[in-house]
A protein has these predicted regions:
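Non-heme di-metal
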Residues: 2-167
């Protein structure tokens, strides 16, 4: 499969996508599609981040977060389907436009960087709750809230990883 082509009205980079979803309070199907791509890309971002350390405990925590990010992408795909937006499956890394060569951020694996990343994950629960509250569909809202609860787990894992690096 080839890399998905993004509609010109959608964010074109992962940085633009993160900024976009952070501002949305009542998501559209297009916003959910952006979220599918961001969540799917985040699996790869966590795997790439894990390459920056040789600490097996930190690697395991980062990989766990990455696996759950892909689960989040699949749940958002389910939201799109439930809301009548058709099929929009989470793409494999090589097909995700937000992972195009050189288009994604990479930061050194330090306790400070992991704590900063954790703040974003903790904010994810509030974002998903806002999105869930705006949806007039109980099944879709429940899927959003499930992702939100796991964002807090991601933040806690990142804090654990920071503590492991601090020894």
């Amino acid at each position: 499969m080839a890399t998905l082509a993004l509609d010109t009205d959608l964010p074109q980079t992962i940085a633009e996508a993160f900024a976009h979803i952070g501002k949305v309070t009542a998501p559209t199907i297009a916003d959910f599609k952006v979220m599918v791509l961001v969540e799917a890309a985040s699996e790869t971002l966590y795997r790439r981040t894990a390459e920056g350390t040789d600490n097996p405990g930190v690697i395991a925590l980062l990989h766990a977060n990455g696996r759950e990010e892909m689960k989040h992408a699949r749940r958002v795909s389910d939201v799109i389907r439930v809301l009548g937006g058709g099929d929009f499956p989470a793409p494999a890394a090589q097909d995700n436009p937000y992972l195009a060569a050189g288009s994604f951020p990479f930061a050194p694996v330090t306790p400070e960087a992991l704590r900063k990343l954790s703040a974003g994950e903790f904010g994810g629960e509030a974002l998903y709750e806002t999105w869930a509250a705006s949806i007039d569909n109980a099944e879709a809202a429940a899927l959003r809230r499930a992702n939100g609860r796991e964002e807090t787990d991601h933040g806690n894992r990142l804090l654990q990883a920071a503590a492991l690096l601090e020894g």
